[in-house]
């Protein structure tokens, strides 16, 4: 049986696992009820669907570990950020944004999403943007855009309770993740700085059972440091010339042993490529043919 915790108007259903393919699900209740990211665990969500009157379903972004049990709540007003909405309307769009479109991984990835995760395209999508408010009757949410992990990643603030939902800006030691084609390291950095300015007594992440209370500044610092630490590892690896695929094979970011047949190899490659772009722009590395190398001064 999964663990739950009530904080003010928010009930947290902690994910069956603290990582993919599950996430924390939130139920926010005023006179109306909002369900957030139904992906904690199937039995709990089937029970929730049978026992609760859900008025709104909100997905923080389009990743499978946040949408896997959406079909249990078909017919409910569906909300997501405008910038991620195309991925809910079209599986092909999602494949393109993830980066599998036109690759050997595409069909297997699509099969996994539709069969294992039950993905269905949604034609009726109510789009929110940064600052959009939702009045549940006695409880008001302010949606907050945290782009980077995906273009439309969105959490929210409940001002009267000083509760901040971080979504997948989850501040874990393993993050952040920018493994999709449409992800952006710089946008993640900017989102961290945005979060730093938000006044909240309680901050809830999408993964793990730790609820953050009070100042999360030091956690934000460590989260950013992970990005810069990865960059240093890449620079160290480029003491001798290496191609993008050779760097991806080292698993410098994920730490997983990956074969090129695994889609996670593509995701590792995507993340490494984003760092290489940053390092090239910063003139810390050079490129000759397909090989990259650290500049002599670095």
Q: What is the predicted function of each stretch?
A:
Residues 1-48, 154-169:
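Conserved beta-strand hairpin/beta-sheet module of binuclear metal-dependent hydrolase folds
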Residues 22, 40-135:
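Active-site HxH/HxHxD metal-binding segment of metal-dependent hydrolases
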Residues 25-27, 108-111, 168-171, 213-214:
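Short, basic/glycine-rich phosphate-binding loops at helix/coil junctions
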Residues 28, 37, 61, 81, ...:
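Divalent metal-coordination and catalytic microenvironments
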Residues 30-32, 50-54, 71-77, 159-162, ...:
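Short glycine/proline-enriched coil/turn segments at helix->beta-strand junctions
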Residues 35-39, 54-65, 78-81, 143-148, ...:
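Active-site neighborhood of phospho(di)ester-bond hydrolases with catalytic His/Asp-centered motifs
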Residues 140-231:
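Metallo-beta-lactamase
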Residues 233-298:
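C-terminal regulatory/interaction regions
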């Amino acid at each position: 049986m999964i663990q739950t915790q009530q904080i003010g108007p928010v009930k947290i259903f902690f994910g069956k696992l603290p990582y993919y393919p599950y996430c924390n699900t939130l139920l926010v209740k005023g006179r109306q009820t909002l369900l957030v990211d139904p992906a904690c665990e199937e039995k709990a969500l089937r029970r929730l669907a049978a026992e609760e009157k859900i008025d709104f379903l909100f997905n923080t972004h389009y990743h499978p570990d946040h949408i896997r049990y959406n079909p249990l709540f078909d017919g409910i007003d569906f909300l997501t950020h405008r910038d991620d909405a195309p991925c809910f309307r079209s599986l092909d769009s999602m494949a393109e944004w993830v980066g599998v479109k036109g690759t050997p991984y595409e069909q297997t990835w699509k099969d996994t999403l539709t069969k294992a995760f039950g993905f269905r395209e949604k034609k009726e999508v109510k789009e929110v943007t940064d600052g959009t408010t939702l009045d549940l009757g006695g409880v008001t949410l302010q949606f907050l855009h945290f782009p980077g992990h995906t273009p439309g990643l969105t959490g929210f603030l409940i001002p009267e309770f000083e509760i901040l939902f971080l979504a997948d800006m989850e501040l874990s030691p393993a993050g952040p993740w920018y493994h999709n084609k449409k992800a952006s390291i710089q946008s993640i950095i900017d989102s961290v700085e945005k979060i730093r300015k938000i006044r909240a007594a309680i901050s809830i992440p999408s993964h793990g059972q730790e609820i953050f209370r009070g100042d999360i500044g030091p956690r934000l610092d460590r989260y950013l440091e992970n990005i810069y630490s990865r960059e240093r590892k890449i620079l160290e690896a480029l003491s001798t010339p290496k191609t993008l695929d050779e760097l991806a094979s080292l698993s410098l970011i994920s730490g997983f042993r990956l074969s090129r047949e695994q889609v996670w190899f593509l995701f590792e490659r995507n993340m490494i490529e984003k760092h290489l772009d940053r390092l090239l722009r910063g003139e810390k590395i050079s490129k000759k043919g397909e090989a990259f190398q650290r500049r002599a001064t670095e």
